[in-house]
Swiss-Prot record:
One of its GO terms (biological process) is UDP-N-acetylgalactosamine biosynthetic process. Cell wall formation. Adds enolpyruvyl to UDP-N-acetylglucosamine. Phosphoenolpyruvate binds at K23, N24. It comes from Streptococcus agalactiae serotype III (strain NEM316). SUPFAM superfamilies: EPT/RTPC-like. PANTHER family: UDP-N-ACETYLGLUCOSAMINE 1-CARBOXYVINYLTRANSFERASE. One of its GO terms (cellular component) is cytoplasm. The keyword Cell cycle applies. The gene is murA2. The lineage of its organism: Bacteria, Bacillati, Bacillota, Bacilli, Lactobacillales. Pathway: Cell wall biogenesis; peptidoglycan biosynthesis. This is UDP-N-acetylglucosamine 1-carboxyvinyltransferase 2.
């Protein structure tokens, strides 16, 4: 098991950093490659992450040919032959996002069996919205133990209202609807950039998806889809993480290829704090002096609100800002576990249900800490950069699910950081 060692206290990040393709986009894109019964699908700008390897194995387990060229960051998928309808348990159980293969397998085969998914332990994350939507489209759903079985000779278009704009459920239902008979409308749909990216891929495959990025999606079913080529959108969460890293170290960093519109909620809060954020031709530049930053209140919301996947990193920034900041987490429960670890570093915080009060400006001290989930891993590493002394971050399996060469990118910007293998 690896660990990351950070020598903090004097870090001031400077330079430029290249952002990878989005983890939260490529996983549903890979699920979508199950749908075409003709031709091959080529995905480019693919991030090299453990979750991507897991999803590759899920798709490959359906008797689909999957070739991952890590050097080129490309995945070529050929699902043109007959495919299996049971997703492999050993891989589905490792990752929450694997539930999005349920809709594509069902739409393609008329039958699908998927185990309950695994992944980060940051709340219950129920999948009832996925199942209700498929039932509205005519599927019969049964749950037996840890398995979900769905059956429908031919899915039918339906009007679906989602009680919550779930990203995963929107993706699952959108993919299933592409091969349904008739028109499907999804109201209160998720609006994230990753939804738009998926819709673009589906339309290149021959689907008829309209309204991506708005509250209402309309999908007109077609008889079959075909392979295509698609470039994975840039990772707004990785970009946001480096923006926060620059701000909390009084740095000056150009985040290359970052998309302003995708990061607008985060940028707004950084600017409210007093961080200088500017759009340049090849990315977004972030400059800050932490001594001049002001405390803020942030509430996480579905897009276009402040992203829950930036909550942990932003609380690390709050820790270095003089005064009392407030973080309200409305999307997932149980997502303040990283603050318990940061208390070991001297953070003063009070947590009451969905709200954390951060008493910032007091010097953090290096300490051994453990990652509790993907984004917490990044937050603890960032906190280590500004803490006095050495911080050792363990349990890096979470980090590798969503960040590629994170420590190397930080080191290139000036951080005193290394990754070592534990004996």
């Amino acid at each position: 098991m690896d660990k990351i060692i950070v020598e903090g206290g004097q870090t001031r990040l400077q330079g430029q950093v290249v952002i990878e393709g989005a983890k939260n986009a490529v996983l549903p894109l890979l699920a979508a490659t199950i749908l075409p019964s003709q031709g091959k699908t080529l995905l480019t700008n693919v991030p090299i992450l453990s979750d991507v390897f897991t999803m590759n194995n899920v798709v490959r387990g359906l008797d689909i040919q999957v070739d991952f060229n890590c050097d080129k960051k490309e995945i070529l998928v050929d699902a043109s032959g007959d495919i299996l309808d049971v997703a492999p348990y050993e891989f589905v159980s490792q990752m929450r996002a694997s539930i999005v293969v349920l809709g594509p397998i069902l739409a393609r085969n008329g039958h699908a069996k998927v185990s309950m998914p695994g992944g980060c332990t940051i709340g219950s994350r129920p999948i009832d919205l996925h199942l209700k939507g498929l039932e509205a489209m005519g599927a019969t759903i049964t749950q037996n133990g840890g398995d979900i079985t769905a059956q429908a000779e031919k899915l039918k278009g339906a009007n679906i209202y989602m009680d919550f704009p779930s990203v995963g459920a929107t993706q699952n239902l959108m993919m299933a609807a592409t091969l349904a008979s008739g028109t499907t409308t999804i109201e209160n749909a998720a609006r994230e950039p990753e939804i738009v990216d998926l819709a673009q891929l589906l339309n290149k495959m021959g689907a008829k998806v309209k309204g991506a990025g708005t509250e209402t999606l309309t999908i007109i079913g077609v008889d079959a889809l075909h392979g295509t080529e698609h470039d994975v959108v840039q990772d707004r969460i990785e970009a946001g993480t480096f923006m926060v890293a620059a701000a909390m170290t009084s740095g000056n960093v150009l985040v290359k290829d970052a998309i302003w519109e995708h990061n607008r909620p985060l940028i707004s809060k950084l600017m409210e704090m007093g961080v200088e954020v500017s759009e340049e031709e090849d990315g977004i530049r972030v400059k800050a002096d932490t001594k001049k930053l002001k405390p803020v209140t942030v509430k996480t919301l579905p897009h276009p609100g402040f992203p829950t996947d930036m909550q942990a990193q932003f609380t690390a920034l709050m820790a270095v800002v003089n005064g009392e900041s407030t973080m309200i987490e409305t999307v997932f429960e149980n997502r303040f576990q990283h603050l318990e670890e940061m208390r070991r570093m001297g953070l003063q915080t009070e947590i009451l249900r969905d709200t954390a009060m951060i008493h910032g400006g007091r010097a953090l001290q290096g300490a051994p800490v453990m990652s509790t989930d993907l984004r917490a891993s990044a937050a603890l590493i960032l906190a280590g950069m500004v803490a006095q002394g050495q911080t050792v971050v363990g349990q890096l399996t979470h980090l590798d699910r969503g960040y590629y060469q994170f420590h190397e990118k930080l080191a290139a910007l000036g951080a005193n950081i290394k990754r070592v293998s534990e004996a």
